[in-house]
Amino acid sequence: SVTDRDGVRYILKTWWEGRECNIRDREECMEAMRLLAGLHKDLEFIPTFPEMEGIPTPVIRRFLPSREYEKHNKELKRARRFLKQRSQKTWFEIRLAAVMDPFLEEAGQICEEWKKIENSHDVEAGETFCFCHGDYQYHNILRQDRGFFLVNFEKCQADGPIRDLYLLLRKLLEKSDWDCNRGEALLAAYESVRPLNPFERQDLFYRLSYPEKLWKIVNFYYNSGKAWIPEKNQEKLDRLLEQETARKKFLRILRP
């Protein structure tokens, strides 16, 4: 980094020329999955630390989604309460209020099931971690004539590989209206390089099952000014509801 005479610090990067992964191109998306699997395979490790007298042995812990989901559920309930008390509602608010109950029921059930699985999983017994990219999305996957490469590792951290896999897979499935054939092909591309173990498959299933897209829509609405609601919010909600049947179908296929 460099600092100018006013004390403002800048980070200088060497930037590579390339274009973003084309999310409409099936083969490019599958290659992005294989690239991710290769990254995880190369960066896998089992945490071991030498014992030192008087110094506690550090422990690397996996991110537990259920804790974040519990927080999201509280935020959804708060927004639902606000909507019920609001006397004059816009069309968006009427639509949102009508679907909150079933989505919240689903979110609560998923959270409880996932907590039981997390609690029964022995995370101390030589668990394998990897260094995750942390923001593995198509705009960080660039292509040159020589092939794909990754940029923006600022969020890189030690965690389970599903952190990256879930993010990219969910984005690609949303863009393809949760096409089951495409979803299975993308997952198969990843597993052709690095197969998932049973716990990782459960992890992926529950992350995809949680209605995170609805939470994002609700969270943006609740924390912004409600006098004027962008038309984009309505479009996102409509698209979410249109895709729900296809999403459920894919989850039935994925369920361990």
State the predicted function of each range:
Residues 1-59:
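ATP-binding pocket architecture of kinase catalytic cores
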Residues 112-162:
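Active-site acidic catalytic loop and adjacent metal/ATP-binding pocket
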Residues 215-256:
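ATP/Mg2+ or Mg2+-diphosphate-binding catalytic cores
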Residues 1-8, 145-147, 255-256:
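Conserved NTP-binding catalytic cores of kinases and kinase-like/nucleotidyltransferase enzymes
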Residues 162-195, 208-228:
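Active-site activation/catalytic loop segments of kinase-like enzymes and analogous catalytic loops
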Residues 10-23, 45, 77-86, 168, ...:
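A glycine-centered beta->alpha junction motif in the catalytic cores
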Residues 19-24, 50-131:
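ATP-dependent phospho-/nucleotidyl transfer catalytic cores
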